[in-house]
Amino acid sequence: MLKRAHYVALHVTLNHNGLSYQRVFSCLTQFPMLRHSSTAAKNNVSMISKFQAPEDKFFPSFSLKSMPKQSSHMSASLLNSLNTSMKKSFSRKKYREAVSLFRKNLWKYEESWIRNQDFIDCCIIACSAYEKLCQPLRIKKTFIILSQLCPKLPAELCRVFLSYATGCVNYGHNVALTCFENSPKELIDYNYWLSWLSFSKSSPVVLWLTFTRISSAGLSPNAETFEILLVAFASQKNFWFFEKTYDLFMQSKLTWRPFTYRVLIESFMKFGNFEEAEKLAYSYVKNKIDSLSSDVFFSAILKFYAVGGDFQGFKKLLSFMTDYNVNFSVSTLNQLLRLNLYHAMDEKISTFSSEHITKLIEQQIKPDLESMLIISEYLNEYKPSPKMRELINWLYSNFHLPKTVSLHFLREVQSLVFRYPLLHSKIHLAISTLKDSGCDWNVGLSYLNWLFVNKRITEAINFFYTITINAGTRPPNELFDVFISNLLKFTSAETTSSAIRKVQSKYPSMCGSSPAIKLILFSKSFSVLQSTSEKIEQLLVSFQRNPSAYSKSFTLALAEWLFSRRLFQSALLYSFKVSDVDDSHFSFRSQILICWCYYRLNDFKSLIQHTNNLLQSNNASLLRRLAATLYRIQIRENNGYKRVLLDRLRKKAILRAFPSRTLNRTEKVKLYNEDAKFRSIFSRVLLHQSHLGNVIS
């Protein structure tokens, strides 16, 4: 996705008065979808934008009402002053002030504004300010408002919103498709659209149907179009669509670009077609398609040899590259490093790779981030020899991050630097790029985990507040989950309670509408709760005073936690509070939990009765879950009588879940005989029930 964003940034050149709009693609965070409603009268332009989420105070509701028409001179002067003020605020990095000016004046909109260059500049500056504030969905909202005010936007605005739509995965297919279809045909680039579908992980069918629209639009696919499709289908491991695209590409007889060879070589390697990939690599060099042949075309093949330990194949290919004067780069250095590290016990391989690494270093080829990651992964698994340690230290001392790097490189540094001890000295760079290029939630999650692991609790709490409450952005559930889980693990119950109440006061929907804090709602927290029972008990005591605390979700989560603590009797009591048989997810989980509680309490009679009650249900989903649960219990049961009973109940649940399976007369007779046998076994089990140890009674 980030590679595609960088590609779009290179191909969309927008610059106005020194303001760069190519960084619109750093806003790849996830925000809640905003709901809106709009009304438009025929002669009275009116629009009401109402946000349902209570935390969305940054973009308040407003309406465009009919205003007395101003003269063209007054309108032009207003737009000119607005444009000047917004530029001044943007240049001073007061982005909130810039968008506030834009919102306050948007309700004065007139039809003549859309043709005014000052108004177009104001829209572009507002979008850039939202990008700086890491609010890509506000840009989407701006596009919706402007498209409602003027169905046909100017080409310059269309181009801006097209670049945002292809650069941000948060737009969703519907809005991005609307942005494409409402734009002038001369601006629509189907390669943009295919690339956006590719990095948004659309299904192969959607990609193929979009590809067929190119022919229906009267256009001919070029080599870039086929490259995008081949990369997408190879990454999804869909060989059928890949082969079909490759056949069409061969039939089209288009001119192959150097990048086409690279795409095909890497794709064939992903599908395991090593011979075809090697054949393409050799033909690329022998035909001298590119006078400066790069070693990146051989990188995937060299990696295959290095990981597999095929020393002869690696040596042969490296000799071929030397004979044809292929330019070596850090790509070959990384594969030699991988061969050296993971086959260091073989003296022959170690000597060969060390010699070539020394030659490449003498050619002023310095290690990059991938080199450091290869070394870090090796150090996490193995203890290097003194000779290897000397080589690693030398490589690390020559590793320097460049001053000017691409967006993709910055994201790599941010997401990986926190996980490898070797890269911890580069954390200051990762934090600075995190602020400059926009908050990526995945990076924030990695950094938050790293702070908690290193016992920097205060910094972790402040960092969470900085990127959520102070920035005015709602955190995703996963980030909130990790934050709460680590607070439960490392801090006191009072600190956890106050932190959750602070987040809930700002974003009530994070913890539910109930004022009680539903701490155990998040599934990932259960592994942490096993070691923090005292803190949870203290929190439960403080929250039990609120009668609204016991919603279905909270009560069921509490029952599951009690079951994990082997408190089966208490878990059974809480499970019965949400045991109403309906189609809800909580009901299914509670019914299954009751079965497990009876089994762990060794109350086989109650388990059979509860199972028979569930068999009266017509809900196929519940019956399928019941059958799976009975099978798991049957595997754990050692008593032969009980195993036969459980197997019989499981078969009944399956038959009830799939009523379309009709039985012939022979099967009905067999089922009747099995019922008689079932009743006999059940009566025998009840006779020995007193010896089974009924805990509840």
Curated annotation (Swiss-Prot):
Subcellular localization(s) per the UniProt record = Mitochondrion
Which residues does the Swiss-Prot or TrEMBL entry list as transit peptide? 1-36
Q: Which UniProt keywords apply?
A: Mitochondrion, Repeat, Transit peptide
Mutant phenotype after disruption? Impairs growth on galactose.
Q: Which InterPro entries match?
A: PPR-containing_protein (IPR050667), TPR-like_helical_dom_sf (IPR011990)
Q: Name one GO molecular function term.
A: mRNA binding
Instruction: Spell out the GO cellular component terms annotated for this protein, sorted alphabetically and separated by semicolons.
Output: mitochondrial matrix; mitochondrion
Biological process according to GO = mitochondrial gene expression
Q: What does this protein do?
A: Mitochondrial RNA-binding protein required for the stability of the cox2 and cox3 mRNAs.
Q: What is this protein called?
A: Pentatricopeptide repeat-containing protein 1, mitochondrial
